[in-house]
Swiss-Prot record:
Positions that bind L-glutamine: G47, E48, S49, R105, I134, R135
Catalysed reaction equations from the record: aldehydo-D-ribose 5-phosphate + D-glyceraldehyde 3-phosphate + L-glutamine = pyridoxal 5'-phosphate + L-glutamate + phosphate + 3 H2O + H(+); L-glutamine + H2O = L-glutamate + NH4(+)
Function: Catalyzes the hydrolysis of glutamine to glutamate and ammonia as part of the biosynthesis of pyridoxal 5'-phosphate. The resulting ammonia molecule is channeled to the active site of PdxS.
Keyword Cytoplasm: no
EC number: 4.3.3.6, 3.5.1.2
Provenance organism: Listeria monocytogenes serovar 1/2a (strain ATCC BAA-679 / EGD-e)
Name of the molecule in the record: Pyridoxal 5'-phosphate synthase subunit PdxT
SUPFAM superfamilies: Class I glutamine amidotransferase-like (SSF52317)
Keyword field contains Hydrolase: yes
Keyword annotations of the record: Glutamine amidotransferase, Hydrolase, Lyase, Pyridoxal phosphate
Endpoints of the signal sequence: none
GO BP annotations listed: glutamine catabolic process; pyridoxal phosphate biosynthetic process; pyridoxine metabolic process
Length: 188
């Protein structure tokens, strides 16, 4: 059985754990670098990316997460996770640099501009995925190595590169497990 960690420093940790378990994998909370040992994949949940980065630095998690990815282990970042995994963040904040694109934080607006949208994802077929966007980022300037999986208003909201999967929205807040199934079946 696949073992998936959830970075448990902020955000929708419990919701991701439920989604992982409902997809048939084992879920573990990751709070320290030694918690990464033995995992097949890692989820960086939504939250506030600046706060998450500061906590990751305080607990010395930035380099261990990069090393985890460099071993070919899969990482799935949602919302703030997308921001942290991007090569660059508009404004010059430090990132993990694991997907070759630039993240635009709060790209669709602030909290009051949060919304839901139907996404047609080729890998999923029908029906469309009902995505929940909360202070959502998006990606720009992807390299040729990045596969765009979904867009809203011509903005990249889901993508993958090698062993890294990112979404600008919160699949863990829906009852639709297709993104986690995709991660477990195609990436891990």
């Amino acid at each position: 059985m696949k073992k998936i960690g959830v970075l448990a420093i902020q955000g929708a940790v419990d919701e991701h754990i439920q989604m992982i378990e409902s997809a048939g994998a084992l879920a573990f909370k990751v709070k320290h670098s030694n918690d990464l040992a033995g995992l097949d994949g890692l989820v960086l949940p939504g939250g506030e990316s600046t706060t998450m980065r500061k906590i990751m630095k305080r607990y010395d998690l930035m380099e261990p997460v990069k090393a985890f990815a460099s071993k070919g282990k899969a990482i799935f970042g949602t919302c703030a996770g997308l921001v942290l995994l991007s090569k660059e963040i508009e404004g010059g904040e430090e990132s993990l640099g694991l997907i070759e694109a630039t993240a635009i934080r709060n790209g669709f607006g602030r909290q009051k501009e949060s919304f839901e949208a139907e996404l047609n994802v080729e890998a999923f077929g029908e029906p469309a995925f009902e995505a929940i966007f909360i202070r959502a980022p998006y990606l720009i300037e992807p390299s040729n190595e990045v596969a765009v999986l979904a867009t809203v208003e011509n903005r990249i909201v889901a993508a993958k590169q090698a062993n890294i999967l990112v979404t600008a929205f919160h699949p863990e807040l829906t009852n639709d497990n297709r993104w986690m199934n995709y991660f477990l079946e195609k990436m891990v």
